[in-house]
From Swiss-Prot:
Primary subcellular site in the record, as a coarse category: cytoplasm
Organism annotation: Sodalis glossinidius (strain morsitans)
Superkingdom: Bacteria
Keywords, alphabetical: Acyltransferase, Cytoplasm, Lipid A biosynthesis, Lipid biosynthesis, Lipid metabolism, Repeat, Transferase
Official protein name in the record: Acyl-[acyl-carrier-protein]--UDP-N-acetylglucosamine O-acyltransferase
GO molecular function: acyl-[acyl-carrier-protein]-UDP-N-acetylglucosamine O-acyltransferase activity
Length: 262
């Protein structure tokens, strides 16, 4: 179904079965598969390929040569009906690739809303990218990676399979991330190590003095006390009784499967 208000360039291919909502713009030489749904006011500039079971929300801007929903690079994949889900108001720049999920990984690759994926960024199968995130040029997520809200991943950085990048994290460019990066932390290097807290980013996002003080205290408990995580958790729990923001650290540590960067 193609809404009457949508614009489809004569050179574009929109296969039967695709759902194109109001005021969508499909530019020259785009290819839209039969199981694709594109939300209202989304713009595909030119040479964009959207295939597989892929749902794209509203008000996205997708630039030339982006490939969304194509077959993943997991050698176990055997054509199962897995999918990609993309939210609203994302900017997906030239040559970005977002691959469909696998049945072993929950069947879906998800990208939230209000993200900027810069040129050549790659989101592999079964990844979950939150909202308000930035992936700079050539940043690469391995399969099953989770990137929480407001995280920034620098250019040419690679994130290992199954890693978790916490909320408000900043990973510097040309880094290799092989373990989980706790929320609010700046990470850099190969292998990535912690370089303090993303204080300026937190201030821009409205964190007040009390919250910043609590985050600093939690960081010191985790990284400067000399304690193991199991030993540090009671102190973090006590701190969280006074400062709710510390629960972000505690919740993250419960999720972590690969251990945190050190």
């Amino acid at each position: 179904m193609i809404d009457q208000s949508a614009f489809i360039h004569p050179s574009a291919i929109v296969e039967d079965g695709a759902i194109i909502h109001a005021d969508v713009h499909v530019g020259p030489f785009c290819v839209i598969g039969p199981q694709v749904e594109i939300g209202a006011r989304t713009v595909l500039e030119s040479h964009v390929v959207v295939t597989g079971i892929t749902r794209i929300g509203e008000d996205n801007q997708i630039y030339p040569f982006a490939s969304l929903g194509d077959v993943n690079q997991d050698l176990k994949y055997a054509g199962e009906p897995t999918r990609v889900e993309i939210g609203h108001r994302n900017r997906i720049r030239e040559s970005v690739t977002i691959h469909r999920g696998t049945i072993q990984g929950g069947e879906v690759t998800r990208v939230g809303s209000d993200n900027l994926l810069m040129v050549n960024a790659h989101v592999a199968h079964d990844c979950t990218v939150g909202s308000h995130c930035i992936m700079a040029n050539n940043a690469t997520l391995g399969g099953h990676v989770a990137v929480d809200d407001y995280a920034i991943i620098g250019g040419m950085t690679a994130v290992h399979q199954f890693c978790v990048i916490g909320a408000y994290v900043m990973v510097g460019g040309c880094s290799g991330v092989a373990q989980d990066v706790p929320p609010f932390v700046i990470a850099q290097g190969n292998h990535a190590t912690p370089f303090g807290l993303n204080i300026e980013g937190l201030k821009r996002r409205g964190f007040d003095h009390a919250a910043l003080h609590a985050i600093r205290a939690a960081y010191k408990i985790i990284y400067r006390s000399g304690k193991t995580l199991d030993e540090a958790k009671p102190e973090l729990q006590a701190l969280a009784q006074e400062h709710q923001v510390v629960n972000t650290f505690l919740d993250f540590l419960l999720r972590s499967q690969r251990g945190i960067i050190r």
